Amino acid sequence: MNENLNGILNVYKEAGWTSFDVVAKLRGILKTKKIGHGGTLDPSVTGVLPVAVGKSTRLLEYMEAAGKIYEGEVTIGFSTETEDADGEIVSKTPVERELTESEIDSVMKNFIGKIKQIPPMYSAVKINGKKLYEYARAGQTVDRPTREITIKSFVRTSPMMTDEAAGLVSFSFKVECSKGTYVRTLAVDLAEQLGYAGHMSKLQRTASNGLMIKDAVKLSEIEVAMEAGELSSLMYPAEYAVSDLPRVNLTADQFEMARVGKKFAEDDWVTDETTDSPVIKSNKSKFLLTDLSELTRDKFAAFYDDKLIAVYMKHPEKAGIWKPNKVLV
């Protein structure tokens, strides 16, 4: 077994593979069990699948929580049981009136910001210990709780394509969204607001954790690199797993505090009027520190000498206190 590998791979997931299939294949190629992916993709969806190897698997939760960017296609005129092109048609609503691009663009703006979404029946969300797709395959429908997601941007990226004979309208889109977003459901809800049944006819993840589709590599390329002893050329540092978190650069004194798991208190900070920078007033030492009271997130990645040292989080019970969520040194 090869237990010395550590880092992030930007894997291009091809159609037909589940995310677990990719992980299982990589375990064989890399000869290590310590592998995990940073966000599930449906079998028909292609694109960026961040994969953590070795000690970097400790950071999987941050990879999974990161925002994602997708590009795909919506088809209006019929819906499917799976909300994508793979499912059986369940409803047909031919587009018989003039649907304009400006109308589509206007409705897409309704989805920007925090919205509620109901997970599709064909999904891995668990209800009463059972995955929704298991209920769906048994012909059962169950109540699903809504979840709050965030849509940062949602725009049409192609002209509207019309098939008058079939009563269909299609167009490409790009969406930047939070963890837990079902883009299939977004497509269905968009069509519904336009007054029709619809589905997501294509989808590709183009970015995740700072990893871009143009740099993604196929499993076959990883296998060749491994055999040639050149895997390091494809491996990204563990820091990519936390690229979605705010970055705080530590001084030497702060590093000593972080590496032994000490907390940071916002009340310890004052402003050095000569530099207009926040400084620590505890321990009789004055050293620069990012003013964490200004951070809008509940976690931050702590770096020293350009290396990831720890991930800190707001204390759940003590206001103004930041505690280590994971110490990595």
Swiss-Prot record:
UniProt-listed InterPro entries: PsdUridine_synth_cat_dom_sf, PsdUridine_synth_N, tRNA_psdUridine_synth_TruB, TruB_C
Coiled-coil intervals, chain numbering: none
Taxonomy, superkingdom: Bacteria
Enzyme class: isomerase
Record-linked Gene3D superfamilies: Pseudouridine synthase (3.30.2350.10)
Keywords: Isomerase, tRNA processing
Keyword Isomerase recorded: yes
Molecular-function GO terms, alphabetical: RNA binding; tRNA pseudouridine(55) synthase activity
GO biological process: one example: mRNA pseudouridine synthesis
Reactions catalysed: uridine(55) in tRNA = pseudouridine(55) in tRNA
Catalytic machinery residues: 42 (nucleophile)
NCBIfam families tied to this protein: TruB (TIGR00431)
Function (record text): Responsible for synthesis of pseudouridine from uracil-55 in the psi GC loop of transfer RNAs.
Protein name: tRNA pseudouridine synthase B
The encoding gene: truB
